[in-house]
Structures are given as structure tokens and as C-alpha cells.
């Protein structure tokens, strides 16, 4: 019975997002966001109940409900003084709606809830929060651009995403700050080209899925568990290492492709200062990916070697290997196809 209810909530989750992105009015978009929110809360509480999960779901609900109420208030204001359409002439209303959507997506300076919520979720729900839950608000943001405010948000997202992950021992919080940094890149892509941010988001989702499925399969949540991970299969360690480099955006892996496209676009638009800051801050995020890789290869903590005994399964091994192959070899395959055609 519980599995059936979870499937229903999952279908509602997908439906809410589709309603939002296909709506031709702000009120319809708001309704889709609410369906999405109310269907994700039960999914957050599935499985083993603990205080961290309950706290995360409550934080998520309060933050999203607050954002939804402000969004509804802004929509009502707009309907009172203007026509109910996508283009707005009122700067205050524009900024109010943009702020609520940034709060829903977890971008800086409205990111405060995101790492704390991620910490209390299992990896699969964390993956949904990092990817699917961002589609609807980011799509609405792309309809409602405010370039001056965008520069501030992009720079702050990249700074917080880079510096926030430096002193983290929790892998979930580290992935949360990584996600905040990637949101900065997506907003930067969105500023110049709508198709470009969708491409970036799709590739980011593939990379996140690849690494999170490995974390989930091997029950890795903290850095000290990675020390024990060093005792495992060397091929698995190698795949984990390459996945982290790919997520960091190093060539010749798939993670380099979205950054390459954004860099090319920024050079064409002559936004070199923004590009310089973005690349410098991304190097900091690459540092904490390399720190994880160093933990996998160099450190061995035998004292707790029993912790990982029988803690992983081979149930999703085919999916994990497929996602690893795409993440690691994707750019090379795309390049070969391009050269052949």
C-alpha cells in the first residue's frame, strides 16, 4: 500500500512541474508549484523515520510555503494593476517574483535552507531536490529576467557554492554547495541563451545522478566513510575518481561540455570579467572534489573497516555503470560523432 501511495505522489510531483512549465498564466504556474511541493513532502518522509528527516521536511515546507505565499501576493498585485500576462512593467513586482523563484530554486542569496534540508534526506530524495525540483522555478525565472539583479545572484551563488563546501565533512552538504555553484552557471547561461541553460541543466542532472547513485549504493554520507572506501574494488574507486573530476568540469569528461558552451557564449557576448570570476571560483569547487578523490586513493583507515562490510548492494550496478560511462566518455563520444558527421 505504501509503495502505491509513493507512486501516486511521484506522478503528482512530475505533473506539478509539467503544469508549471506549460502554463500560460502566473496563477496556473503557482498552482503547479503547489502541487509539486505538496507531493514532495510525503516522499521526503518515506523509509526510516528519524529526527533529521522530519526536520528537513519541515524546513523545506516552511521555506517553500513562505515563497509561495509571497509569489501569490505578487501575482494578485499584478492582476490588480496590470493584465495577467508574462511580461511585467512594474519593477517592484518583477523583483518580488524573481526573489521568490530564486528562493524556491535555492540560489544565493536565498540559499540558506538548501544545505540543511539536503543533510536530512536520503540520496535519492537529495537527487530529486538538486535536479527535478529546480526545473519549474528556473523555467519561470527564464521568462522573467532582470539583468542587474542577475549579476548579483550569479556572483553570490558562485562565491557561496565555492567557499561553502571547503570545510564540509558531510557529502550531502558538499553536494548542496556544489549545486548552488552550478545554479550560478545556469543563470549565467540563461542570461544570454535560453536553450543553453536547458542543455547545462540536462548535463548537470546526468552528472549528479551518476555520482549520487554511487554514494547511495555504497552508503557514503561523510568523509570518514570515504577513508574506508579506499579498501574496496580499485575499479570502483577509479570510476568514483573520474566522476568527481567530471562533475568538477575537467576535460575530457562530459562535465566540461556545459561549461565549455557557457564560456564560448560569454566570450561571444564580451562578458570577460564575469567569465574570469566564474572560472576562478569553479577552481575552488574543483579543489573539494579533488580532496574527495585524495581520500579515496591515498587514505586508509583500517580501524573501522567493518563499517562497510555488507553495506552495499549490486542491485543498481548496471544503471551505475551506464551512468558512469556517459559521465566519463560522453564528451569524447559527442566529439567523435561531430567529426564523423
From Swiss-Prot:
Compartments where found: Mitochondrion inner membrane
Q: Where are the transmembrane segments?
A: 8-28, 61-81, 95-117, 145-165, 195-215, 238-258, 266-286, 320-340
Q: What kind of membrane protein is this, topologically? A: Multi-pass membrane protein
Which Pfam family name is an example for this entry? NADH_dehy_S2_C
Q: Which GO terms describe its cellular component?
A: mitochondrial inner membrane
Listed InterPro entries: Complex_I_Subunit_2, NADH_DH_su2_C, NADH_UbQ_OxRdtase_chain2, ND/Mrp_TM
Major location (coarse): mitochondrion
Q: What is its EC number?
A: 7.1.1.2
Mention one GO molecular function: NADH dehydrogenase (ubiquinone) activity
Identify its protein family: Belongs to the complex I subunit 2 family.
Q: What is this protein called?
A: NADH-ubiquinone oxidoreductase chain 2
Amino acid at each position: 500500500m505504501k509503495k502505491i501511495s509513493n507512486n501516486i505522489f511521484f506522478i503528482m510531483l512530475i505533473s506539478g512541474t509539467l503544469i508549471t512549465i506549460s502554463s500560460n498564466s502566473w496563477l496556473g504556474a503557482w498552482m503547479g508549484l503547489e502541487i509539486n511541493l505538496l507531493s514532495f513532502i510525503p516522499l521526503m518522509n518515506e523509509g526510516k523515520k528519524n529526527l533529521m528527516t522530519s526536520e528537513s521536511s519541515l524546513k523545506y515546507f516552511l521555506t517553500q510555503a513562505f515563497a509561495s505565499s509571497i509569489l501569490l501576493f505578487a501575482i494578485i498585485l499584478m492582476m490588480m494593476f496590470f493584465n495577467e500576462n508574462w511580461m511585467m512593467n512594474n519593477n517592484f513586482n518583477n523583483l518580488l517574483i524573481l526573489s521568490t523563484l530564486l528562493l524556491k530554486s535555492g540560489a544565493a542569496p536565498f540559499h540558506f535552507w538548501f544545505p540543511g534540508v539536503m543533510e536530512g534526506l536520503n540520496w535519492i530524495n537529495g537527487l530529486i531536490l538538486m535536479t527535478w525540483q529546480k526545473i519549474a522555478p528556473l523555467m519561470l525565472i527564464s521568462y522573467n529576467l532582470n539583468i542587474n539583479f542577475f549579476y548579483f545572484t550569479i556572483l553570490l551563488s558562485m562565491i557561496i557554492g565555492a567557499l561553502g563546501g571547503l570545510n564540509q565533512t558531510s557529502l550531502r552538504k558538499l553536494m548542496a554547495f556544489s549545486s548552488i555553484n552550478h545554479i550560478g552557471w545556469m543563470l549565467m547561461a540563461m542570461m544570454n541563451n535560453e536553450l543553453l541553460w536547458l542543455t547545462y541543466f540536462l548535463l548537470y542532472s546526468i552528472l549528479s545522478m551518476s555520482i549520487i547513485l554511487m554514494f547511495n549504493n555504497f552508503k557514503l554520507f561523510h568523509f570518514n566513510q570515504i577513508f574506508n572506501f579506499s579498501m574496496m574494488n580499485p575499479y570502483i574507486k577509479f570510476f568514483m575518481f573520474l566522476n568527481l573530476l567530471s562533475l568538477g568540469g575537467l576535460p575530457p569528461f562530459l562535465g566540461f561540455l556545459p561549461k565549455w558552451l557557457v564560456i564560448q557564449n560569454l566570450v561571444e557576448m564580451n562578458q570577460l570579467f564575469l567569465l574570469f570570476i566564474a572560472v576562478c571560483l569553479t577552481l575552488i569547487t574543483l579543489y573539494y572534489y579533488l580532496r574527495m578523490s585524495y581520500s579515496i586513493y591515498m587514505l586508509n583507515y583500517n580501524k573501522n573497516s567493518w563499517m562497510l562490510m555488507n553495506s552495499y548492494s549490486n542491485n543498481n550496478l548496471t544503471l551505475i555503470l551506464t551512468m558512469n560511462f556517459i559521465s566519463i566518455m560522453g564528451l569524447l563520444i559527442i566529439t567523435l560523432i561531430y567529426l564523423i558527421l
